[in-house]
UniProtKB/Swiss-Prot annotation:
It is found in: Cytoplasm. ATP binds at K585. A motif ('HIGH' region) lies at residues 42-52. This is Leucine--tRNA ligase. GO terms for molecular function: aminoacyl-tRNA deacylase activity; ATP binding; leucine-tRNA ligase activity. One of its GO terms (cellular component) is cytosol. It comes from the Bacteria. Keywords: Aminoacyl-tRNA synthetase, ATP-binding, Cytoplasm, Ligase, Nucleotide-binding, Protein biosynthesis. Belongs to the class-I aminoacyl-tRNA synthetase family. InterPro entries: aa-tRNA-synth_I_CS, Leu-tRNA-ligase, Leu_tRNA-synth_edit, M/V/L/I-tRNA-synth_anticd-bd, Methionyl/Leucyl_tRNA_Synth, Rossmann-like_a/b/a_fold, tRNAsynth_Ia_anticodon-bd, Val/Leu/Ile-tRNA-synth_edit. HAMAP family: Leu_tRNA_synth_B (MF_00049_B). PROSITE patterns: AA_TRNA_LIGASE_I.
């Protein structure tokens, strides 16, 4: 055996051994005491940097630890392989197909992952762009379509002029495309949607079940779903040609409505604009269409609008009120129309001031007298109703309930629950995605592709030009087809599905990745799901996690699975920064894992990633840090080389004698560390303190070895210590641990060994340290044998030199002893 630590050689050896022996395989029949450990799969856009590596290492420590605790661990990996970057690469480079670009990157990343020693069961790999996967993504679409949960409609959508495709609301961040940062425009297009709004209440209510999720993620989902209870009120148009329906959470302010406002995107604008106002309205709409939708509706943005020429009638008092188009109204929220109460809503107040519209106070704060003349901003607090007909004098909270009931009684409104959540827009005008499995027949209309004809395959020979239309439009062999219903001529849907559809169910496919006649076997997924531990970035809190919860609930309702939440526990890891910024090629601050592995070894890289900060927090990369973890592992190696030959042939003895205090202290420290690291991993994955504890423990061992003549070493203690230490190290640094374990003559892989047991007796201290107070002030500390009785402890305290200094020549009135904690001596 090598006497010098050579991490690269050791790591290649054990990675080869694991692969040859299929070490991490688990069968579906091993679901008894199961543990499904899953890290969010990556998009294969290129090579990984150490920022990507963090969550894979976290997931691997958990997987290896759980195996040692006796669990059958499913720990699969795959690739979220459809998406724009592959298609953009084809457009930009002109000589590579998106599939080829994607598969090249997958091979690169797969090799990188294997060099990290991650214990994945590669037989379960899924790749979402392969036909054997997206066939079942299409199957899921068909199940939603058959059950009224997938539909097509024309609506204003978010359009990215750079990516040349539509975006779901969740993919727009501060008015910009989440992927490329381009300002998003609004277009009216026919698109496919999933009816996630049907599940809004379930998605909200079931957040309470998720006790193993971070609170901030649950709050983000709750806010995105955005439940509010209020009243829906009908405002008839004064021309008698219909009505405007508005939603309000403040029906108590109905008597303060002085105008109505429509979102610029609302189809009602065209209907309600009179001929004499059409030029002004169209000019306004043109100008607003160029504005960032989210900036224009932000709190401090300037409020602008134009009069449509139409009026509505306030149903509570019969007043005729003007209808405006206003830039601060969002079409997606509510009904796209609002009743404006300038006295009690700040945005309405600013608009009314600008256009000289009436402001009527209908809520008066108690003990104060507001007037329209002295009102400098909207009053939004609690108060008593004024100028509100029969409800005048009620406090506004009571009025909300009573006015809502009155509206229902008068049949001019009703109490409704509304959600900010909008249906999931899944159409994409791009090639590299799963084709939507429907055809359009002049005779039969929209016809779903029969399940037996799946998958609807992507053709390879397409032209990659970002025209704003799907490249599949110009592919006659793909587009032209026959109707599965009548056999006549038909055209295929040429849009593809949002890639979040692919990732909304992949955790199910891992259970049966090669099944050909269905996406998964119900019995198998019911045995293995929900995922016990899911690991990934908090940036997926709304998109991927919400969609996955939705799809799981749909599949449960349709009888395909027996659980309604996909992920029992969720851990969101922090990012790794360098030079104060997130790692990216454009910033030139990327740290390559290959370079670190070549220089320091995989185990040193893994150990540093875990040691640098609590795993949920962001951390700054520092080269000296990995140098430190390399030195630690080198010290582990050298220490084991020092003692190995003396203990290798020893049998493990359960109750060996400890000859002196240093041996007792070392064994106590060992079992304190087992207790601490077990707690660190079981509690909240505090791997940084686990690594720190191992470093401290190694120092204790070396202190014992250096301060004891080697002929006096307690070899039974060293045998127990060295085995338990390497067992605790193994989830963190598996390669060096496997090598040292083998050197102890062990035949099985170390992760198949049991996690060290805590000896509670070893934790008991033989000495205790007590605080000594004199007249209530701390004056000394004494260390005494734990077996001393109260009188002996008191005598020991009185003899202490520091205590003597404060009691000499004084009368002791009493001595109070709190066992194992404190002695208080009262003197006069």
């Amino acid at each position: 055996m090598e006497k010098t630590y050579n991490p690269q050689e050791i790591e290649r050896k054990w990675q080869r051994n694991w692969q040859e022996k299929d070490a991490f395989k688990v069968s579906n029949e091993e679901y008894h005491k199961k543990y499904y450990d899953l890290v969010m799969f990556p998009y294969p856009s290129g090579t990984l940097h150490v920022g990507h590596v963090k969550n894979y290492v976290i997931g691997d420590v958990i997987a290896r630890y759980k195996r040692m605790r006796g669990y059958n661990v499913m720990h699969p990996f795959g690739f979220d392989a459809f998406g724009l970057p592959a298609e953009n690469a084809a457009i930009e480079k002109g000589n590579i197909h998106p599939e080829d670009w994607t598969m090249q990157n997958i091979n690169i990343i797969r090799n990188q992952i294997k060099k990290l020693g991650i214990s994945y069961n590669w037989e379960r790999e899924v790749i979402t762009c392969k036909e054997d996967y997206y066939k079942w993504t299409q199957w899921i679409f068909l199940q939603l379509y058959k059950n009224g949960l997938a539909y097509k409609k024309k609506a204003p959508v978010n359009w990215c002029p750079n990516c040349k495709t539509v975006l779901a609301n969740e993919q727009v961040v501060n008015g910009k495309c989440e992927r490329c940062g381009t300002v998003v425009e609004i277009k009216q297009l026919e698109q496919w949607y999933f009816k996630i709004t049907d599940y809004a209440e379930k998605l909200l209510y079931d957040l309470e079940k998720l006790s193993g999720w971070p609170e901030n993620v649950k709050i983000m989902q709750k806010n995105w779903i955005g439940k509010s209870v209020g009243a829906e009120v009908e405002f008839n148009l004064d021309n008698g040609k219909g009505s405007l329906r508005v939603f309000t959470t403040r029906p108590d302010t109905l008597w303060g409505v002085t105008f109505m406002a429509l979102a610029p995107e609302s189809p009602l604008v065209e209907e309600l604009t009179t001929p004499e106002n059409s030029e002004k309205v169209n000019q306004f709409l043109q100008r607003v269409s160029l504005q960032d939708r989210f900036k224009r509706t932000a709190e401090g943005a300037e409020k602008e609008g134009v009069f449509t020429g139409s009026y509505a009638i306030n149903p509570v008092n019969g007043e005729k009120i003007p209808i405006y188009v206003a830039n601060y109204i969002l079409y997606e929220y509510g009904t796209g129309a609002i009743m404006a109460v300038p006295a009690h809503d700040q945005r309405d107040f600013e608009f009314a001031k600008k256009y000289d519209l009436p402001i009527r106070i209908v809520i008066m704060p108690e003990g104060d007298e507001l007037t329209e003349e002295n009102l400098e901003k909207a009053y939004i607090g609690e108060g008593v109703l004024v100028n509100s007909g029969e409800f005048t004098g009620l406090d506004n909270q009571t009025a909300i309930r009573e006015v809502s009931q009155w509206l229902e009684d008068k049949k001019i409104g009703k109490v409704v629950t509304q959600y900010k959540l909008r249906d999931w827009l899944i159409s994409r005008q791009r090639y590299w995605g799963a084709p939507i499995p429907v055809v359009y027949c002049e005779k039969c209309g929209v016809v779903p592709v029969p399940e037996k004809d799946l998958p609807v395959k992507l053709p390879r020979d397409v032209a990659f030009e970002p025209t704003g239309k799907s490249p599949l439009i110009d592919h006659p062999d793909f587009k032209e087809t026959t109707c599965p219903k009548c056999g006549g001529k038909a055209k295929r849907e040429v849009d593809t599905m949002d890639t979040f559809v692919d990732s909304s169910w992949y955790y199910l496919r891992y259970v049966n990745p090669k099944l050909e006649d269905k996406p998964f076997n119900k019995e198998d997924v019911d045995n293995w799901l929900p995922v016990d531990q899911y690991i990934g970035g908090v940036e997926h809190a709304i998109l991927h996690l919400l969609y996955s919860r939705f799809i799981t609930k749909v599949l449960k309702d349709l009888g395909y699975v027996s659980f309604d939440e996909p992920f029992k526990n969720l851990f969101t890891q922090g990012m790794i920064y360098r030079n104060g910024a997130k790692m990216s090629k454009s910033k030139g601050n990327v740290v390559s894992p290959e370079e670190m592995i070549e220089k320091y070894g995989t185990d040193a890289l893994r150990t540093y990633i875990l040691f640098m900060a609590p795993p949920e927090r962001d951390a700054e990369w520092n080269d000296s840090g990995i140098e430190g973890t390399y030195r630690f592992l080198n010290k582990v190696w050298n220490t084991y080389m020092k003692i190995q030959d003396k203990i290798i042939h020893l049998e493990n003895k359960p109750n060996y004698p400890l000859k002196n205090k240093s041996e007792k202290d070392l064994r106590r420290k060992l079992h304190q560390t087992i207790e601490k690291i077990t707690s660190d991993i079981e509690g909240n994955f505090q791997f940084n303190t686990a690594v720190s504890s191992l470093m401290e423990l190694l120092n204790e061992l070396n202190s014992y070895l250096n301060n004891t003549d080697d002929k006096d070493w307690n070899l039974n203690l060293l045998k127990e210590f060295s085995e338990d230490f390497v067992l605790m190290l193994s989830p963190i640094a598996p390669h060096i641990s496997e090598e040292l374990w083998k050197n102890f003559g062990k035949d099985e892989f170390i992760f198949k060994a049991s996690w060290p047991e805590i000896d509670k007796n070893a934790l008991k201290a033989e000495e205790i340290t007590l605080a000594v107070q004199i007249n209530g002030k701390l004056r000394a500390q004494i260390t005494v044998d734990v077996s001393l009785n109260e009188d002996e402890v008191k005598s020991y305290a009185l003899e202490d030199d520091k205590v003597q200094k404060y009691i000499s020549g004084k009368k002791i009135q009493k001595i109070i002893y709190v066992p194992k904690k404190i002695i208080n001596i009262v003197v006069k």
